[in-house]
Amino acid sequence: MSSMRENKAESLIVELAAKYIAREAGRGTLITPLRADISPDRKNATIYVSVFPDDQGDHALAFLKRHKDLFRNSMKRTTRLAILPYITFELAYGE
């Protein structure tokens, strides 16, 4: 069961990911962050995204993996999380 602090951090990470993706992604594909899971030690976070159209999922995931360090640097500038997690992106199936 997640603590209130973890829930807040997960919500913040999803919100920041949505803003970053809206700013940096191309206009041909809709990438929407749905949720984030933070590890118990708060050092790693997985962001689950949905992609439309569905056949662009691999391209969108490749884009996100290329930009994960830039996104983490953006988070570093805009948040005051005690531990800034390393980010991985995964496609959300069936959500």
Where are these regions (language model features)?
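Charge-rich, low-complexity N-terminal segments
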Residues: 1-95
